[in-house]
Amino acid sequence: VNAGPGRVGAAPVALVATTAEVLAHPELDEGLLAPWERHRLAGIRVPARRDDVVAARLLLRLCASRVTGLPPRAVEPAQRCPGCGRDGHGRPYLPDHPGLGASFSHADGLAAAVVGPGPVGIDVEPLTRRPGPVPVLRRLLPHDEVDAACAEPEPGPALLRLWVRREALFKAGRDDVPLTAWTDRRRAAVVALAAADGATGATGVGGACRGAGTDGATGAGRADRGAGADRAAGALVPALSLGPAPWPSRSPAPPSGR
């Protein structure tokens, strides 16, 4: 199945939600997952973590659906590890849509995904998480960016913003992709999005479209300031509305969410 002409040139679509919101969405259910994905889920022993993984994979399908115009069940993501060359893990991609990039993330009751032309990457972390001891971060991240974050009035949140930005760029596979970071206060989440074109960003669903630059219960989020050069808040286009009403709700080491 291929998207119609012009679809691949569409703006990226990025979605962020709680795991409960995703699992309650009427278009999404675990039956959409491929057999190889369900096989991998069988190895996850912690129910909450399993739900997070399911939610992220379903959200990726919803993003792909919004970009291609196909129903979520017609989208079949795959994964391939660039290191070992084996399938089933590593960077996600859409075999039937080679012009589109894909990325997802999950962490402690949160899920995020993005699909769009060219390289894309997304990362989400709980607002209260701290990425780890500074000496460890200096081994993983550019020293000058870590030092700049440490010089902020609140180093913990600044280091978390730095971490999610770098994770988003890592997932995109390039350091020169435009980067946007914002805080979703309603879901107590920090999000970073790397996308080659201006993304249609959405935090959750429901209600009328809200413009960028908001920092409340339903907005797309404000652009965070701090270490690293992000696009201004105005670069976020209005949030995508997926329905007439909101979705029903149903470390010493670096963050583990992916």
Predicted segments — roles?
Residues 1-210, 215-258:
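Core catalytic alpha/beta fold that binds nucleotide/phospho-ligands
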